[in-house]
UniProtKB/Swiss-Prot annotation:
Glycans are attached at residues 59, 74, 250, 399, 651, 772, 867, 989, 1364, 1422, 1426. It comes from Rattus norvegicus (Rat). Homotetramer; disulfide-linked. Is able to inhibit all four classes of proteinases by a unique 'trapping' mechanism. This protein has a peptide stretch, called the 'bait region' which contains specific cleavage sites for different proteinases. When a proteinase cleaves the bait region, a conformational change is induced in the protein which traps the proteinase. The entrapped enzyme remains active against low molecular weight substrates (activity against high molecular weight substrates is greatly reduced). It comes from the Eukaryota. Induction: By inflammatory stimulus in liver. The level of this protein increases during acute phase, then decreases again. The gene is A2m. Belongs to the protease inhibitor I39 (alpha-2-macroglobulin) family. Highest constitutive expression in ovary. Low level in testis, uterus and non-acute phase liver. Protein found in plasma. It is found in: Secreted. This is Alpha-2-macroglobulin. Gene3D superfamilies: 1.50.10.20, 2.20.130.20, 2.60.120.1540, 2.60.40.1930, 2.60.40.1940, Alpha-macroglobulin, receptor-binding domain (2.60.40.690), Immunoglobulins (2.60.40.10).
């Protein structure tokens, strides 16, 4: 009995099928009307969609209504569709816009006189999304470069959208917004933008973040790093995979220059198989098995070798299943090294079988066909081998042979398969049955495939042949359809109509029919339909082909076709020619759909080697689609569909005395399942489902309950989507060559003429084009080879000191296929002496891929930048090169390179500036300029110039990024690069002198300054001098207030993230005490602000000024309490003995002026007037303990920072009066301005940072208050007692123009005369050098070198510099100090050793700038600070001169010390 029961269970699927076939049907019954409506289960709001209607066997006119129902109400899609005969038709409709995704009911109602059909089901309606992407001009940037980028928006058909972009910003690695654009419209579907990086940005990964109109966020990454572009590429070629049985593998390494030529040099290759859990405790084997190879590269720049795999123990477990290959090439001659790597996977799979192009379902009566692929462990097909294929259900067991592609085809007869599944097995060889602990055994992988039956009550089937390959666009696909029909089910039908739909990107895009004639006895066969593959079907097309039989059964099949990611706008890009010499012209032709807007880009391949990027490609564009292929029902639209067909009763049946019971079989697929897999919702009264077995309760004695469960088929195989000349002179070396927008003409062509840059490299160019007709198109990447058949490179130091000698080397490289005879010549110049180091030859032979170096011993004679011009020319010579006759190339037969060398005078450079403000007012005014020099001046080092400007801010405007000849490496100093731009813009705006050029430059400086300042921000919103560094994380109250007011004032010109302002203000408010004053946090780098007991008042006054300057009202709680603190302090100081510090008074006067308290301001100004230093035509203020000035000086030195700052605050107080300063105020201000302008340096700045910011603010305010347009030009005449004379004119049109003349004789006396109207600002700059001399300095500096002598052989090329620094001045300690160590000529600092200095508690920061090392010291006391770092030889120099070390107080420039040092081998030539 048990045996019979098991057998009965096995036959259950067959019995159910038999029972269903025996159900009573009436073949002669009249056919009922059939209604079928299909619509995608996912709809897009605002985008045209399609629904397809099929009405068959209509016997009356019907009206069709389609609507969408949601909680927001009903929306009718069709109301006027009336059908009176059979119809197959697809109609477009548009779902109204929606602000969010929403599940809705899609309802279909068909109503006639006697029939009514109504069905509804859920669909998901997604809100409309645009496809937005960004493109940067390159993937990686250096500090200080400009990031250029484009934003593009498309609809889902890839047509351009001129949408509004609400927000776009740049985010740095610390998540700061450093630039922002709001509410801008795209034009032609795109917008091109740019922003400059600061010179010291946070390095790392940045993002362009785009907020679309729908609220979606799109990001595009790029990197900012300090890097040197690779000179050549190291290509490592290794097998992708090897098996554990292989005994050797080939390793190949090639070095290729970016211009495509081989690299000469030596390669070192390391091949390792690492241990999975490495340990340093058990020898090298517990880390990795490694093999090292080293060899000279051949003439092709390559190295190749067969490597034995035995040493890598491929069969051992516990080691990684891969070999890591690292290669390093050292270039011959230069020692430049570049690296490359490769990876080889290890597999124990020796052979592998897989099924190809097989269906997931079979249909009884239609052969089941497919292919089996046999590959080896590397994935390479194995041809002409015998494999076994078996299928138990079909009683099939055969051997077959693979073809030349490793494929074996099979066909299985399904006529006698009675079950619901078919399992096919493919086998090649048995795997090794051995097993060893810690050893790998080889395996031969078999293949299995199970296909499930398709359900049809009439046993009628349709099968679409699948295709193995991805289809090309613009081809016609012939789809083969195989059918088998039940003759009885066809009744008397003469023809059968097959209907088909094609879906792509989640929507219905095509529909059609095929009529099949029917003949008795011919119910089995095949036919084909033709489908044109176009862009509307990409990237995945799904086809459903079906027919409705007379009995209402739907028979059909679906197929999926992958199509290449093609775009309708065909874009091509061509360089003519595609290679050329530097500085020649080339034509870039763009071909696209007429009137397309095209974005062009060409980048140096070296950049892409540095950081490979994912090129803009069709696949990336298709990845933007919200739906590439709709499968199944989306979440929310996956409810169980209603089934009106009822169920089959579970009547027991006895066959041969055995009890059988029908059960639901879940493996068979019906038509409903096929349509659901395509994501189609179907509303029909036809038969598309297999019958459902009625549920029946059973007691425990029956068949186990598990057999009654109905499995719901898979629902959520959801959406594939992605949110996520003859002679050349070379000097121009960009990283991005082309970044342009062009519009093609009506013929679809645009031509751009370009000049080839001087970089010898391969340029990679691409274009995308946007057309309103055809949409987006992408060009293939094209190359332009910028190359010279031979060229010359120079090797020389950055700078030398006059009197030193060096070797100038010129290397000529030949890449012609023939030999050339080259003459190398150094152009003579009066600026240097040069002699060949070898016996001079007229010419040299250089054959293919060879090089020749010529060298000269050079002694510079002139100071400044000295140009060296070297040319290499191919000669027309009959003299043989070996056995070859040298040739002369048609192009590029001569290459000339010009490089400059800085020749500096001996000693230490000084600069003295004399300033005058001359206002003729209709009468002539004159002034004597007496240029004197100290007795110890270095010969020929003196030079002088006079600058004439019509505006007191003119010099500062020209030099806003170079106001001080000092470093800008901390958070305070950076602000002198930022804040003055605000005052310049304000002043020029108010005086209506602002030009677009000045505005653009100033805003760029503000943007970079903003970025840089964020480096010094703390997490709590405060700022400190050197940022949030471990051990130096004390926030600075004073600097935070400075940044806060500057950011607030800059908001009207650039984007400043409000977060930074809000956080800084909150942090400052937390530092306010109960009495309204502010507590100090962090060190003050300028201790002139430390006024003893007045520290708190001075700081509070400064913060109050900052809050008022950022336009906070006096009623603001923080401001109100701060003013209370200041008022209390002033009343206390006024009534007490000794009064208040001048510096504090100046701040108080300006603070009360800003607060509108004019009475208190006047009271303080009156007190200050009593302490003023009044000279003949000027007024200023000094500190009581002002450091004394050396009597040895022959000129009046520039005033210290504190004097300038306090005097500028007094000027601001005079000028801050409502509604405007009085004439009395302006008269007093004029005297202050005359003194201030005399203190300016040659760049328009002052002594230090804070005084420069405050003084320029005050001068700009004075300029605005007194600005008038002169009716008559001012004439300036400068003449000497000799023959020199020159004239300038200053008028309203050129008053911002900087006019300069070099004075011919120094020393000497010159007279300046000014006539006409208006004021003229005159500035004389005198520069000279003096030798360091022994004298008393406020700092003590001792410099030593290790080793101290040249006895150590290493001293020729490397030595250590040791500094011992202490402060011996009048104060207890200095302000922040800078140690400026100049390099000995030919030597460069070893950067890691300089960076290590920052570990010292005394060192806040280090910089390497050209041939100087700058060390920032928080302060220096009488305790000696020891610092040391290492330098190494870069270029050998003879007769080395000593170099100078200067230590100076950043805020008291008169406090400094100098010392000199020499290289251990100063008089030796080193290794030359």
């Amino acid at each position: 009995m048990g045996k019979h029961r098991l057998r009965s269970l096995a036959l259950l699927p067959l019995l159910l099928r038999l029972l269903l076939l025996l159900l009573p049907t009436d073949a002669s019954a009249p056919q009922k009307p059939i209604y079928m409506v299909m619509v995608p289960s996912l709809l897009h709001a605002g985008t045209p969609e399609k629904a397809c209607f099929l009405f068959s066997h209509l016997n009356e006119t019907v009206a069709v209504r389609v609507s969408l129902e949601s909680v927001r109400g009903n929306q009718s899609l069709f109301t006027d569709l009336v059908v009176d005969k059979d119809l197959f038709h697809c109609t477009s409709f548009t779902v109204p816009q929606s602000s969010s995704d929403e599940v809705m009911f899609f309802t279909v109602q068909v109503k006639g006189a006697t029939h009514e059909f109504r069905r509804r089901s859920t669909v998901l309606v997604k809100k409309k999304e645009s496809l937005v992407f960004a493109q940067t001009d390159k993937p990686i940037y250096k500090p200080g470069q400009t990031v250029r980028f484009r934003v593009v928006s498309l609809d889902e058909s890839f047509h351009p959208l001129n949408e509004l972009i609400p927000l776009l910003y740049i985010q740095d690695p610390k998540n700061n917004r450093i630039a922002q654009w709001q509410n801008f419209n795209l034009e032609g579907g795109l917008k091109q933008l740019s922003f400059p990086l600061s010179s010291e940005p946070t390095q790392g990964s940045y993002k362009v973040v785009i907020r679309t109109e729908s609220g979606r966020t799109v990001e595009h990454p790029f990197s900012v790093e300090e890097f040197v572009l690779p000179k050549f590429e190291v290509r490592v070629t290794v097998p992708e995979t090897i098996t554990i049985l292989e005994e050797e593998m080939n390793v190949s390494v090639c070095g290729i220059y970016t211009y495509g030529k081989p690299v000469p040099g030596r390669v070192t290759v390391n091949i390792c198989r690492k241990y999975s859990n490495p340990s340093n405790c058990f020898g090298e084997e517990s880390v990795a098995f490694c093999e090292k190879l080293s060899q000279q590269l051949d003439g092709r720049g390559c190295f190749s070798q067969l490597v034995k795999t035995k040493s890598f123990q491929l069969k051992r477990q516990e080691y990684e299943m891969q070999l890591d290959v690292h290669a390093k090439i050292q270039e011959e001659g230069t020692g430049v090294e570049e690296t490359g790597k490769g990876l080889t996977k290890i597999t124990r799979t020796i052979t592998k079988l897989s099924f190809v192009n097989v269906d997931s379902h079979f249909r009884q009566g239609i052969p089941f066909v497919g292919q089996v692929l046999l590959v080896d462990g590397r994935g390479t097909p194995i041809p002409y081998e015998t494999i076994f294929i078996g299928a138990d259900e079909a009683n099939l067991y055969i051997n077959t042979t693979t073809d030349k592609h490793g494929l074996a085809r099979f066909s299985i007869n399904t006529d006698d398969i009675m079950g619901t599944s078919l399992t096919v097995r493919a086998k090649y060889k048995d795997s090794n049955a051995c097993y060893g602990f810690r050893w790998l055994t080889e395996e031969n992988v078999e293949a299995w495939h199970t296909a499930y039956a398709v359900f049809s009550p009439s046993r009628s089937f349709l099968h679409l042949e699948s295709l193995p390959d991805k289809l090309r666009c613009d081809q016609t696909l012939e789809v083969q359809a195989h059918y088998i029909l039940n003759g009885e089910a066809m009744q008397e039908l003469k023809e059968l109509v097959f209907y088909y739909l094609m879906m792509a990107k989640g929507g219905i895009v095509r529909a059609g029919t095929h009529v099949l004639p029917l003949k008795q006895g011919q119910m089995r066969g095949h036919f084909s339909i033709l489908i044109s593959m176009e862009t509307d079907l990409a990237p995945v097309a799904r086809l459903v082909l079906y027919a409705i039989l007379p009995n209402g059964e739907v028979v059909g099949d679906t197929a999926k076709y992958e199509i290449e990611n093609c775009l309708a706008n065909k874009v091509d890009l061509v360089f003519r020619p595609n290679s050329g010499l530097p500085a020649t012209r080339a034509l870039l032709s763009v071909m696209a759909s007429p009137q397309s807007l095209c974005g062009l880009r060409a980048v140096d391949q070296s950049v892409l080697l540095m950081k490979p990027e994912t090129e803009l490609s069709a696949s990336l564009i298709y990845d933007l689609l919200p739906v590439k292929d709709l499968t199944g029902f989306p979440q929310g639209a996956d409810q169980r569909e209603e089934d009106t067909n009822g169920c089959v009763k579970q009547n027991d049946t006895y066959i041969n005395g055995i009890l059988y019971s029908p059960v639901q079989n879940t493996n068979e697929e019906d038509m409903y399942g096929f349509l659901k897999d395509m994501g189609l919702k179907v509303f029909t009264n036809s038969n598309i489902r297999k019958p459902k077995v009625c549920e029946r309760l059973r007691d425990n004695k029956g068949i186990p309950a598990a057999y009654h469960l109905v499995s719901q088929s898979h629902m959520d195989a959801f959406l594939e989507s992605s949110e996520s000349p003859t002679e050349t002179r070379r000097s121009y070396f960009p990283e991005t060559w082309i970044w342009d927008l062009v519009v093609v003409d009506s013929a679809g062509v645009a031509e751009v003429e370009v000049t080839v840059p001087d970089t010898i490299t391969e340029w990679k160019a691409g274009a995308f084009c946007l057309s309103n007709d055809t949409g987006l198109g992408l060009s293939p990447v094209v190359q332009f080879q910028a190359f010279q058949p031979f060229f010359v490179e120079l090797t020389m130091p950055y700078s030398v000191i006059r009197g030193e000698a060096f070797t100038l080397k010129a290397t000529v490289l030949n890449y012609l296929p023939t030999c050339i005879r080259v003459a190398v010549q150094l152009e003579a110049s009066p600026d240097f002496l040069a002699a060949p180091e070898e016996k001079e030859q007229r010419s040299h032979c250089i054959c293919m891929n060879q090089r020749h170096t010529a060298s000269w011993a050079v002694i510079p004679k002139s100071l400044g930048n000295v140009n060296f011009t070297v040319s290499a020319e191919a000669l027309n010579s009959k003299e043989l090169c070996g056995n070859e006759v040298p040739v002369v190339p048609e192009q590029g037969k001569k290459d000339t390179i010009i490089k400059s060398l800085l020749v500096e005078p001996e000693g230490l450079e000084n600069e003295v500036t004399f300033n005058s403000l001359l206002c003729p007012m209709g009468a002539e005014v004159s002034e004597l300029i007496a240029l004197k020099l100290p007795s110890d001046v270095v010969e020929e080092s003196a030079r002088a110039s006079v600058t004439v400007l019509g505006d007191i801010l003119g010099s500062a405007m020209q030099n806003t990024q170079d106001l001080l000849k000092m470093p800008y490496g901390c958070g305070e100093q950076n602000m002198v690069l930022f804040a003055p731009n605000i005052y310049v813009l304000d002043y020029l705006n108010e005086t209506q002198q602002l030009t677009q050029e000045i505005k653009t430059k100033a805003i760029a400086y503000l943007n970079t300054g903003y970025q840089r300042q964020l480096n010094y921000k703390h997490r709590d919103g405060s700022y400190s001098t050197f940022g949030d560094k471990p051990g130096r994380n004390h926030a600075n109250t004073w600097l935070t207030a400075f940044v806060l007011k500057s950011f607030a004032q800059a908001r009207k010109y650039i984007f400043i993230d409000e977060v930074h302002i809000t956080q800084a203000l909150l942090w400052l408010s937390q530092q306010q005490k109960d009495n309204g004053c502010f507590r100090s946090s962090g060190s003050l780098l300028n201790n002139a602000m430390k006024g003893g007991v007045e520290d708190e008042v001075t700081l509070s006054a400064y913060i109050t000024i900052a809050l008022l300057e950022m336009s906070l009202p006096v009623t603001h709680p923080v401001v109100r309490n701060a003013l209370f603190c200041l008022d209390t302090a002033w009343k206390s100081a006024r009534g007490g003995a000794g009064g208040s510090h001048v510096y504090t008074k100046a701040l108080l006067a300006y603070a009360f002026a800003l607060a509108g308290n004019q009475d208190t301001k006047k009271e303080i100004l009156k007190s200050l007037d009593e302490e003023a230093v009044k000279e003949e035509d000027s007024v200023h203020w000094t500190r009581p303990q002002k450091p004394s000035v050396s009597v040895a000086l022959w000129y009046q030195p520039q005033a210290p920072s504190a004097e300038v700052e306090m005097t500028a605050y007094v000027l601001l107080a005079y000028l801050t009066t409502e509604p405007a300063p009085t004439q009395e105020d302006l008269t007093a201000a004029m005297l202050i301005v005359k003194w201030l302008t005399k203190q300016q340096n040659s760049h328009g700045g002052f002594s230090s940072t804070q005084d420069t910011v405050v003084a320029l603010h005050a001068l700009s305010k004075y300029g605005s208050a007194t600005f008038t347009r002169a009716k008559k030009a001012a004439q300036v005449t400068i003449h000497s007692s000799g023959t020199f004379s020159t004239k300038f004119q200053v008028n309203n049109n050129n008053q911002l123009l900087l006019q300069r003349v070099t004075l011919p004789t120094v020393p000497g006396d010159y007279t300046v005369k000014v006539t006409g109207e208006g004021c003229v600002y005159l500035q004389t700059s005198l520069k000279y050098s003096v030798l360091p001399r022994e004298e008393e300095f406020p700092f003590t500096v001792v410099v030593q070198t290790l080793p101290g002598t040249c006895e150590d052989p290493k001293a020729h090329t490397s030595f250590q510099i040791s500094l011992n620094i202490s402060y011996t001045g009048s104060r207890s300690e200095s302000n922040m100090a800078i140690a400026d160590v100049k390099m000995v000529s030919g030597f460069i600092p070893l950067k890691p050793t300089v960076k290590m200095l920052e570990r010292s508690v005394h060192v806040s920061r280090t910089e390497v700038s050209n041939n100087h090392v700058l060390i920032y010291l928080d302060k220096v006391s009488n305790q000696t600070v020891n610092l040391s770092f290492t330098v190494q030889q870069d270029i050998p120099i003879r007769d080395l001169k000593p170099a100078v070390v200067k230590v100076y107080d950043y805020y008291e420039k008169d406090e400094f010390a100098v010392a000199k040092y020499s290289a251990p081998c100063s008089t030796d030539y080193g290794n030359a």
